[in-house]
A protein has these predicted regions:
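N-terminal active-site beta-alpha-beta segment that forms phosphate/nucleotide-binding
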Residues: 18, 30-162
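Redox-cofactor binding/interface segments in oxidoreductases and associated redox assembly factors
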Residues: 80, 168-169
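Short glycine-rich anion-binding loops that position phosphate/pyrophosphate groups of nucleotides
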Residues: 84-86, 171-175
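Surface-exposed, charge/polar-rich loops and edge strands
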Residues: 14-18, 30-35, 42-45, 49, ...
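Basic polycationic patches enriched in arginine
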Residues: 24-27
Length: 211
């Protein structure tokens, strides 16, 4: 199952998308990708804090529903992200997943040397519920870390093929489910390495929809 969870003020609407569309987004309204990113981020930034919090809470509630419907198989692992700026915030979902006994992982950017060595720009590291404030890659999600900079015994890498669900950030999406990211290509490289059974879920507000 692959879907985008979209929040409106009073409802949640899941939209099926095609994984092959990730990383490919048609130009919208005569804009190039950079212009489109700026325009959509500005629209998202314009949401006041209370509205953004309400929308994020609604998104997380829908994610918890998906979590509950994923079956009793254990152990399970889910990757989320640490929200930056005005992004939809999956923190409440991450807490709920941990309470359900799921292993929760966060993106950790690789150093240039490690990127060359493994062919990926990021990995997912497991973080126990009480350790989130101590994880440097959560505090600084865009910073690159050498393997020796992170305590791998405390924050072990979760192999991509071991993930059962991944929650993906995005800038914009359209009615076909195509996703526009931030332009770094990290998820474009990472997502194809996941198990075919992994649920890939992009979360956004309806203000980020571009048709």
């Amino acid at each position: 199952m692959v879907c985008v969870v979209v929040s409106t003020f009073d409802q949640i609407k899941p939209t099926k998308i095609n994984l092959s569309l990730f990383g490919r987004f048609e130009r919208g309204a005569g804009m190039d990708k950079a212009e489109l990113r700026r325009a959509v981020i500005a629209r998202r930034d314009a949401l006041d804090l209370d509205m953004r919090a309400a929308k994020s809470a609604a998104v997380c509630a829908r994610l918890v529903e998906l979590l509950g419907g994923s079956g009793p198989v254990a152990p399970r692992a889910v990757a989320v992200y640490a929200a930056m700026g005005s992004e939809a915030d999956p923190a409440a979902f991450a807490a709920a997943a941990a309470k359900h006994g799921w292993r929760v992982a966060y993106p950790c950017m690789f150093s240039a040397a490690d990127t060359v060595a493994c062919g990926q720009r990021m990995c997912m590291r497991a973080v126990a519920a009480g350790d989130a404030s101590e994880a440097p890659f959560i505090a600084h999600p865009t910073r690159a870390f050498a393997a020796t900079d992170v305590d791998s015994s405390r924050f072990p890498i979760v192999p991509a093929e071991a993930l059962d669900m991944i929650v993906v950030p995005l800038v914009a999406f359209d009615h076909t489910g195509a996703r526009l990211g931030y332009g770094g290509g990290c998820y474009d490289r990472y997502l194809p390495t996941l198990s075919p059974a992994c649920q890939i879920i992009g979360i956004a507000f309806d203000e980020q929809r571009v048709d």
